[in-house]
């Protein structure tokens, strides 16, 4: 049976993935003129925003001035072999909740998508949030993401002479590593 023109589906009938609706923080950033990408909220409904590494410090400072005064978590993950590395920052407006100005917690997660080629890097936010110190060091140690301007840019968990980044999906574990005994 040959298809006739009435049976063919037009390209207008094919569903197109809609862009996520910008959340309140994304809308505020738009009003302030900050370039970013609204991402889908996570499974708990937390707003997620994609930013370029170049704008990370400026957008982080803007969020801090807008009440996001606590860096709850910073970390990284690998999207898979040959894919991007992701560095994320989870901010919370803690003072508003403690002061009783709000009944619900405002939170937002920034994500910076990086190429795994070469030495992926982005600016440190240690100057804005001191709590980023060990979190950025752990992300460097496990994924090899360099944080420019970090005051203590060295490994946190692995020995200083360790080769590679253990939480990357393409990491190959060495057959043997001899550690010096402290005793």
From Swiss-Prot:
Gene Ontology CC annotations of this record: plasma membrane-derived thylakoid membrane
This protein's name: NAD(P)H-quinone oxidoreductase subunit J
NCBIfam families: PRK12494.1 (NF009141)
Subcellular location: Cellular thylakoid membrane
Biased composition regions of type Polar residues, renumbered to the chain: 1-12
Residue spans crossing the bilayer: none
PANTHER family per the UniProt record, alphabetical: NADH DEHYDROGENASE [UBIQUINONE] IRON-SULFUR PROTEIN 3, MITOCHONDRIAL (PTHR10884:SF14), NADH DEHYDROGENASE UBIQUINONE IRON-SULFUR PROTEIN 3 (PTHR10884)
Segments for region (Disordered): 1-29
Organism taxonomic ancestry: Bacteria, Bacillati, Cyanobacteriota, Cyanophyceae, Synechococcales
Cross-referenced Pfam families: Complex1_30kDa
Topological category with respect to the lipid bilayer: Peripheral membrane protein
Gene for this chain: ndhJ
Highest taxon of the lineage: Bacteria
Record carries keyword Translocase: yes
SUPFAM superfamilies, A to Z: Nqo5-like (SSF143243)
Record's keyword annotation contains Phosphoprotein: no
């Amino acid at each position: 049976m040959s298809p006739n023109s009435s049976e063919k589906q037009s390209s207008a009938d094919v569903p197109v993935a809609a862009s996520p609706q910008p959340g309140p923080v994304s809308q505020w950033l738009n009003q302030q003129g900050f370039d970013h990408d609204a991402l889908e909220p996570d499974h708990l409904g937390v707003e997620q925003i994609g930013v370029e590494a170049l704008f990370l410090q400026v957008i982080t400072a803007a969020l801090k001035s807008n009440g996001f005064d606590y860096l709850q978590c910073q970390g990284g993950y690998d999207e898979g072999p040959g894919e991007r590395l992701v560095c994320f920052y989870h901010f919370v407006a803690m003072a508003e909740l403690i002061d009783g100005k709000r009944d619900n917690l405002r939170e937002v997660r920034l994500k910076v998508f990086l190429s795994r080629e070469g030495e992926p890097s982005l600016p440190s936010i240690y100057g804005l949030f001191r709590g980023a110190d060990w979190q950025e060091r752990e992300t460097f140690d496990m994924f090899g993401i360099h944080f420019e301007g970090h005051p203590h840019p060295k490994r946190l968990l692995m020995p200083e002479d360790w080769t590679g980044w253990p939480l990357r999906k393409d990491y190959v574990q060495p057959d043997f590593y001899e550690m010096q005994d402290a005793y």
